[in-house]
Amino acid sequence: MARLGLLALLCTLAALSASLLAAELKSKSCSEVRRLYVSKGFNKNDAPLYEINGDHLKICPQDYTCCSQEMEEKYSLQSKDDFKTVVSEQCNHLQAIFASRYKKFDEFFKELLENAEKSLNDMFVKTYGHLYMQNSELFKDLFVELKRYYVAGNVNLEEMLNDFWARLLERMFRLVNSQYHFTDEYLECVSKYTEQLKPFGDVPRKLKLQVTRAFVAARTFAQGLAVARDVVSKVSVVNPTAQCTHALLKMIYCSHCRGLVTVKPCYNYCSNIMRGCLANQGDLDFEWNNFIDAMLMVAERLEGPFNIESVMDPIDVKISDAIMNMQDNSVQVSQKVFQGCGPPKPLPAGRISRSISESAFSARFRPYHPEQRPTTAAGTSLDRLVTDVKEKLKQAKKFWSSLPSTVCNDERMAAGNENEDDCWNGKGKSRYLFAVTGNGLANQGNNPEVQVDTSKPDILILRQIMALRVMTSKMKNAYNGNDVDFFDISDESSGEGSGSGCEYQQCPSEFEYNATDHSGKSANEKADSAGGAHAEAKPYLLAALCILFLAVQGEWR
C-alpha cells in the first residue's frame, strides 16, 4: 500500500509539473512573438503573454494563437510594406543602373560635341585666321543645331546639313570672287548649283550620311536608356490588392501567431504568392525582352559604322578638306556658275583691291598639328561605354519574369529550397505540396494562394508595355539608319503604382473574409493538424501515462 501511495504521489507531482511546463512553454512561445512584435514598433499591449483562442482571426489559422485581432491587422499592413520594400529594392537596383548609364552617355555625347566644336574653332583660327573669325557664326550655328538635335530631336539633320553647305558655298563663292558684287538673288542662284557642281567634292554627301546615322543611333540609344529607367521606376511602385495582402500576411506573419517565429515560408509557397501578386509585372517580360534585344542591336551600330565618336572627332578636318576642294576648283566652279546665273557685276577698282586685301584667301591650306587633340569625352570612350551597357542589358533580360523568384531568394522572404520540410506552408511547419504556377496574368487562374482577377490587367503596366513597344520600333529604325521621332512618357502615370487592380471596382476591405482554402482538406492542412496535435499533446503525455500505470497496478492486485 505504501508503495502504491508513493507511486500515486509521484504521478500527481509529474502531472502538475507537466501542466506547469506546458504553461511555461506557452509563455515562452508568446513572449518571443511579443518581443518581435514590439521590436517592429508596435504596442506591446496588443500582444498576449499566453496563447489565446483564435476565433477572432480573419486571415491566420483560427487555432490557439499568440496574435490578437490588433496584431493581425498591424501584421497585415506590415506584410504589405515588407513586400513593397523588397520589390522596390530589386527594381531600384535595375533603375539605378539605367539611370547611371544614361547619365554617362548623356555627358559623353554633350562633351563630345563641345570638344569637336572647340577643336574646329582652334584649327580654323590657326589655319584661316581673321577670315574664319568673320564667318565663325556659320560654324557655331552648325554645332548649335547638332546639340539641339541631340537634346530635343526637333531638327531635320539632312535639311540642316544641306543648309550649312549652301551657306558655306555662298561665303566661299564671295571670297574666291571678291572682285565681283553679288546680290542675294544671285547667291540664291549659286546655291542651286551645289548638287550639280559638287564644289566641296564628296565630303558633304559622306558627312551627311555619317552624321545622320551616328546622331540618330546615339540619341536613340540614350533615349532608350532613359525609357528603361522610367519604366522600371514606375513599375517598381507596387500596390498589392486586398487578396494579395491577405496572402502576404498569411505567408510572412501568420507563422508568428503559431509561435513559429524562426520558421520561414517555403520557397514554392512564396513563389506562388509572388507570381500572383506580381502577375501584371510578369506581362511586361515579352516587350521588355524585345526592347533589350533592340537596344543591343543599336549598341552594335554604335560600336561599328554609326560610331558618333569616329564621326565627330575628325569633323574639323573633313570640313577643311571640303574648303580646300572648293579652293582648288574655284575657277571651274565660278565659270559654270557664271554660265548658269549670268555674269556678275564687277566692283569699282578701289573696292576690288580693298576686298581682295580683306579676304586674303589666296593662301593655301596650311596643315594643322594640334599640340593635344581631345580623343575622348567625359574621361572615357564610346567603345568602353557601349561594352559596359551591353553587359548590363544582357543581365536585365527576363527581369520581370524572374522577379518573383528573385524576391523569394531574399532570405527575409522565404527559406531556401534545401529546407523543403522545415518551412512554413501557410498552415504549419511542413512541406509545401502545391505546384508553382506560371508567370503573367493569364496563368493565375489556378493559383492556389492568391485570387487574381485575370480579366482586368493593370493600366499602368499596359502603358509601359506600349512605351516599350514604341521605343523598340524606334530602335529598329535607328539600327537601319533612319531618323526617328520621339514621344514623351514623362507625364504618364505619374505617382501611380502597379498592382492595385482597383481602378474598375471598389477595393474590398482588408479583413472582409477569412482566407479561402482552395483545396479543401489539403495535404498541407492535414500535415499541419498533425503537427499542431503533437505540440498540444506533449505537456500532458506524462500525466496520461501515470494514470494508465495506476489503472494497470489496480488490475495486477
Curated annotation (Swiss-Prot):
<keyword id="KW-0336">GPI-anchor</keyword>
<feature type="propeptide" description="Removed in mature form">
    <location>
        <begin position="530"/>
        <end position="557"/>
    </location>
</feature>
<dbReference type="Pfam" id="PF01153">
    <property type="entry name" value="Glypican"/>
</dbReference>
<dbReference type="GO" id="GO:0042734">
    <property type="term" value="C:presynaptic membrane"/>
</dbReference>
<dbReference type="GO" id="GO:0098696">
    <property type="term" value="P:regulation of neurotransmitter receptor localization to postsynaptic specialization membrane"/>
</dbReference>
<feature type="modified residue" description="Phosphoserine">
    <location>
        <position position="357"/>
    </location>
</feature>
<feature type="glycosylation site" description="O-linked (Xyl...) (glycosaminoglycan) serine">
    <location>
        <position position="500"/>
    </location>
</feature>
<feature type="glycosylation site" description="O-linked (Xyl...) (glycosaminoglycan) serine">
    <location>
        <position position="494"/>
    </location>
</feature>
<feature type="glycosylation site" description="N-linked (GlcNAc...) asparagine">
    <location>
        <position position="514"/>
    </location>
</feature>
<keyword id="KW-0597">Phosphoprotein</keyword>
<keyword id="KW-0472">Membrane</keyword>
<protein>
    <recommendedName>
        <fullName>Glypican-4</fullName>
    </recommendedName>
</protein>
<keyword id="KW-0964">Secreted</keyword>
<dbReference type="GO" id="GO:0098978">
    <property type="term" value="C:glutamatergic synapse"/>
</dbReference>
<keyword id="KW-0654">Proteoglycan</keyword>
<feature type="glycosylation site" description="O-linked (Xyl...) (glycosaminoglycan) serine">
    <location>
        <position position="498"/>
    </location>
</feature>
<feature type="lipid moiety-binding region" description="GPI-anchor amidated serine">
    <location>
        <position position="529"/>
    </location>
</feature>
<dbReference type="GO" id="GO:1905606">
    <property type="term" value="P:regulation of presynapse assembly"/>
</dbReference>
<keyword id="KW-0357">Heparan sulfate</keyword>
<dbReference type="GO" id="GO:0009897">
    <property type="term" value="C:external side of plasma membrane"/>
</dbReference>
<dbReference type="GO" id="GO:0005615">
    <property type="term" value="C:extracellular space"/>
</dbReference>
<dbReference type="GO" id="GO:0009966">
    <property type="term" value="P:regulation of signal transduction"/>
</dbReference>
<keyword id="KW-1003">Cell membrane</keyword>
<dbReference type="GO" id="GO:0099560">
    <property type="term" value="P:synaptic membrane adhesion"/>
</dbReference>
<comment type="function">
    <text>Cell surface proteoglycan that bears heparan sulfate. May be involved in the development of kidney tubules and of the central nervous system.</text>
</comment>
<dbReference type="GO" id="GO:0062023">
    <property type="term" value="C:collagen-containing extracellular matrix"/>
</dbReference>
<dbReference type="GO" id="GO:0045202">
    <property type="term" value="C:synapse"/>
</dbReference>
<comment type="similarity">
    <text>Belongs to the glypican family.</text>
</comment>
<keyword id="KW-0732">Signal</keyword>
<dbReference type="InterPro" id="IPR001863">
    <property type="entry name" value="Glypican"/>
</dbReference>
<dbReference type="GO" id="GO:0005796">
    <property type="term" value="C:Golgi lumen"/>
</dbReference>
<feature type="signal peptide">
    <location>
        <begin position="1"/>
        <end position="18"/>
    </location>
</feature>
<keyword id="KW-0449">Lipoprotein</keyword>
<dbReference type="InterPro" id="IPR019803">
    <property type="entry name" value="Glypican_CS"/>
</dbReference>
<dbReference type="GO" id="GO:0016055">
    <property type="term" value="P:Wnt signaling pathway"/>
</dbReference>
<keyword id="KW-0325">Glycoprotein</keyword>
